[in-house]
From Swiss-Prot:
Keywords: Cell membrane, Cell projection, Cytoplasmic vesicle, GTP-binding, Hydrolase, Lipoprotein, Magnesium, Membrane, Metal-binding, Methylation, Nucleotide-binding, Prenylation, Protein transport, Transport
Motif Switch 1: where in chain: 35-49
Motif (Switch 2): 67-84
Gene giving rise to this polypeptide: RAB25
Protein name: Ras-related protein Rab-25
Binding site for GTP: 21, 24-27, 38-39, 43-44, 70, 125-126, 128, 156-157
Similarity section: Belongs to the small GTPase superfamily. Rab family.
Propeptide segments, given as residue ranges: 211-213
Residues with lipid group (S-geranylgeranyl cysteine): 209-210
Function: The small GTPases Rab are key regulators of intracellular membrane trafficking, from the formation of transport vesicles to their fusion with membranes. Rabs cycle between an inactive GDP-bound form and an active GTP-bound form that is able to recruit to membranes different set of downstream effectors directly responsible for vesicle formation, movement, tethering and fusion. RAB25 regulates epithelial cell differentiation, proliferation and survival, thereby playing key roles in tumorigenesis.
GO cellular component: Golgi apparatus; pseudopodium membrane; recycling endosome
Topology of the protein relative to the lipid bilayer: Lipid-anchor
Modified residues (Cysteine methyl ester): 210
Domain comment in the entry: Switch 1, switch 2 and the interswitch regions are characteristic of Rab GTPases and mediate the interactions with Rab downstream effectors. The switch regions undergo conformational changes upon nucleotide binding which drive interaction with specific sets of effector proteins, with most effectors only binding to GTP-bound Rab.
């Protein structure tokens, strides 16, 4: 997956980062978009987003990654935060089981606010802290499989799987979008074919136009 200038792109995909405060969402964002890591552990206040344009085949995708704090007092922003999102990384801290124990609640909140077709990846962050692990890989992987989620373990500190996590989500979104466009094109072709087969041309052409919008 290659880089491209921010002004030159074919699609914009909004991806949200969700999960408890302190799991490393902000550092995943900064590692992916700016290749930076901050050891300052202050909690993110409010909402921020960063962008990075990447190539998927011949298509330029502008990934708009949104980040917010996981504290209860900021939950009032959820509707606007999730609006328009086509992808989500649900992040927990591998070294703190309590952050994993609430991923189901975060998943419910996501589905309450976002489209049902949103692509979701469960991300176990801080994989570099091997000795402090509290969440077994297979336990998290099984939860992801049972809930139809993608799954990866990452380390924003040493960059392990950060690129792969975002790339996998973006590819899955792009695949869905491509299929929708193909289905729309196929539907238009059928409508136009019906018009040519004997329907009133004006009506058939109008129907195809409406379907494609």
């Amino acid at each position: 997956m290659g880089n491209r200038t921010e002004e030159d792109y074919n699609f914009v995909f909004k991806v949200v980062l969700i999960g408890e405060s302190g799991v490393g969402k902000t550092n995943l964002l900064s590692r992916f978009t700016r290749n930076e890591f901050s050891h300052d552990s202050r909690t993110t206040i409010g909402v921020e987003f960063s962008t990075r344009t990447v190539m998927l085949g011949t298509a330029a995708i502008k990934a708009q990654i949104w980040d917010t704090a996981g504290l209860e007092r900021y939950r009032a922003i959820t509707s606007a935060y999730y609006r328009g999102a086509v992808g989500a990384l649900l992040v927990f801290d591998l070294t703190k089981h309590q952050t994993y124990a609430v991923v189901e609640r975060w998943l419910k909140e996501l589905y309450d606010h976002a489209e049902a077709t949103i692509v979701v990846m469960l991300v176990g962050n801080k994989s570099d802290l091997h000795q402090a692990r509290e969440v077994p890989t297979e336990e998290a992987r099984m939860f992801a499989e049972n809930n139809g989620l993608l799954f990866l373990e990452t380390s924003a500190l040493d960059s392990t799987n950060v690129e792969l996590a975002f790339e996998t989500v973006l590819k899955e979104i792009f695949t869905k979008v491509s299929k929708q466009r193909q289905n729309s094109t196929r539907t238009n072709a059928i409508a136009l074919g019906s018009a040519q087969a004997g329907q009133e041309p004006g009506a058939g052409q109008k129907r195809a136009c409406c379907i494609s919008l």
